[in-house]
């Protein structure tokens, strides 16, 4: 009797450990895991702080939405473990803030290299067409302000 109870507890513990260990792998491989609130595409949510596995932009849904064939590992509001933030690349369309590489079209703030088209602020090198502010070298055509050397045609201010 005692052995049976111990075996069940061990099985439950092992199952939980496997489920928790597989979540970061799915986040890395699939790029979308376990949203913990309803998100509409382009609504401008962020993935910083203590939010658990939220995805930004381009993904709408609510509750526990899992991807990559994994199901039944989350319950309740969809939070799995504390302070587990997503670090997988994705391609949202607009209004996101994150710390992972992506190729957005507009209105993003991040700290990794990318090739956006408009309206971005970042601290890494990029090749941009318009309206950017950054602190690293780039080749830009118009309307930029930065604090590093660059080759620009018009409307730039620099301090080096």
Swiss-Prot record:
Region (6 X 12 AA tandem repeats): 86-157
Lipid-bearing positions (S-diacylglycerol cysteine): 30
PROSITE patterns tied to this protein: PROKAR_LIPOPROTEIN
Lipidation (N-palmitoyl cysteine): 30
InterPro entries: VlpA-F-like_signal, VlpC_N
Biased composition (Polar residues): 93-160
Entry membrane topology: Lipid-anchor
Signal sequence, renumbered to the chain: 1-29
Sequence repeats, residue ranges: 86-97, 98-109, 110-121, 122-133, 134-145, 146-157
Annotated segments matching region Disordered: 32-160
Summary of the function given for this chain in its UniProt record: Responsible for the antigenic diversity for host adaptation.
Note: The numbers of repeats can vary and is one of the basis of the antigenic diversity.
Entry protein name: Variant surface antigen C
Natural source organism: Mesomycoplasma hyorhinis (Mycoplasma hyorhinis)
Species lineage: Bacteria, Bacillati, Mycoplasmatota, Mycoplasmoidales, Metamycoplasmataceae
Gene: vlpC
């Amino acid at each position: 009797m005692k052995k049976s109870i111990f075996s069940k507890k061990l099985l439950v513990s092992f199952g939980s450990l496997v489920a928790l260990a597989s979540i970061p792998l799915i986040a890395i491989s699939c790029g979308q895991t376990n949203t913990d609130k309803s998100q509409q595409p382009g609504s401008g949510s962020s993935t910083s702080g203590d939010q658990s596995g939220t995805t930004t932009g381009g993904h709408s849904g609510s509750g526990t939405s899992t991807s990559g064939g994994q199901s039944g590992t989350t319950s309740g509001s969809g939070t799995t473990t504390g302070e587990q933030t997503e670090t997988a690349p994705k391609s949202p369309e607009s209004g996101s803030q994150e710390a992972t590489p992506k190729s957005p079209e507009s209105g993003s703030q991040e700290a990794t290299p990318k090739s956006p088209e408009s309206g971005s602020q970042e601290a890494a090198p990029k090749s941009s067409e318009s309206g950017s502010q950054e602190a690293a070298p780039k080749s830009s055509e118009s309307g930029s302000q930065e604090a590093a050397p660059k080759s620009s045609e018009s409307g730039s201010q620099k301090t080096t």
